[in-house]
UniProtKB/Swiss-Prot annotation:
Gene: pstB1
Keyword annotations of the record: ATP-binding, Cell membrane, Membrane, Nucleotide-binding, Phosphate transport, Translocase, Transport
Subunit structure: The complex is composed of two ATP-binding proteins (PstB), two transmembrane proteins (PstC and PstA) and a solute-binding protein (PstS).
Its biological purpose: Part of the ABC transporter complex PstSACB involved in phosphate import. Responsible for energy coupling to the transport system.
GO cellular component, one term: plasma membrane
Record-linked SMART domains: AAA
Reaction(s) catalysed by this chain's protein: phosphate(out) + ATP + H2O = ADP + 2 phosphate(in) + H(+)
Tagged with keyword Nucleotide-binding: yes
GO molecular function, one term: ATPase-coupled phosphate ion transmembrane transporter activity
Organism the protein comes from: Mycobacterium bovis (strain ATCC BAA-935 / AF2122/97)
GO biological-process terms attached to the record: phosphate ion transmembrane transport
EC number: 7.3.2.1
Stated name of the protein: Phosphate import ATP-binding protein PstB 1
Length: 258
């Protein structure tokens, strides 16, 4: 079931470095929120904070609140593994397990949870591949290695793997940056379908992509080199691209910088 994410006064640090300052925003269920901004502005850092992936970096810490519905994912006693199960991640480059079969790639997360029933695994593999619009392309070669698929197919395989564990939220970090235009179109069409079931947050440098796939857009920027990234503005995507409140947003959208 899709859930809402709320960030309140979030500050992100790596050791003594203040990476992102004072971010407050609401990410609505069954919608796509795009995070945009120049390189180094903190948008990917914010994305990784939403499921505690940044914690793999030594010295990383977060101040403020990140709520999944009403549950603070940083509260004492909250298991990061459980958070990452509820809030899945699709990375910039497709990262299937190359020697593992297509079927086993999809159900890898379920197996880690201890699921061994073959029918459950097979049914989940099929439903997830259908959900990722990949089933018809691979149904006759499920036992072939996932690494043998094209780049676009591999990314959809990674999306199938993410939704197999039934998350509430899907995070996507520039999911089309390494793909050709045809594969990019397939992923964008898939995102539009997936938002009917999931809350989706996507980081993208492609302004046209943000305009096409998202319902709301958040623009991040840096005050200066060495200063923390900040949320400049968040609004409906239509407003951000047609009549933003902040000049910095307009300048970035129009290509004057970034």
């Amino acid at each position: 079931m899709a859930k809402r994410l709320d960030l309140t006064d979030v500050n992100i640090y790596y050791g003594s470095f203040h990476a992102v300052a004072d971010v407050s925003l609401a990410i609505l269920p069954r919608s796509v929120t795009a995070l945009i901004g120049p390189s180094g502005c903190g948008k990917t850092t914010v994305l990784r904070t939403l499921n505690r992936m940044h914690e793999v970096i030594p010295g990383a810490r977060v101040e403020g609140a990140v709520l999944l519905d009403d549950q603070d994912i940083y509260a004492p006693g909250i298991d990061p593994v459980g958070v990452r199960r509820a809030i899945g991640m699709v990375f910039q480059r497709p990262n299937p397990f190359p020697a593992m079969s297509i079927r086993n790639n999809v159900v890898a997360g379920l197996k880690l949870q201890g699921v061994r029933n073959r029918k459950v695994l097979d049914d989940t593999a099929e439903s997830s591949l259908r959900g990722a619009n990949l089933w018809d392309e691979v149904k006759d070669r499920l036992d072939k290695p996932g690494g043998g698929l094209s780049g676009g197919q591999q990314q959809r395989l990674c999306i199938a793997r993410a939704i197999a564990v039934q998350p509430d939220v899907l995070l996507m970090d520039e999911p089309c940056s390494s793909l050709d235009p045809i594969s990019t179109m397939a992923i964008e069409d898939l995102i539009s379908e997936l938002k009917q079931q999931y809350t989706i947050v996507i980081v993208t440098h492609n302004m046209q992509q943000a305009a096409r796939v998202s319902d709301q857009t958040a623009f991040f920027n840096l005050e200066a080199v060495g200063k923390p990234g900040r949320l400049v503005e968040i609004a409906s995507t239509e407003k951000i691209f047609s009549n933003p409140n902040q000049k910095a947003t307009e300048d970035y959208i129009s290509g004057r910088f970034g």
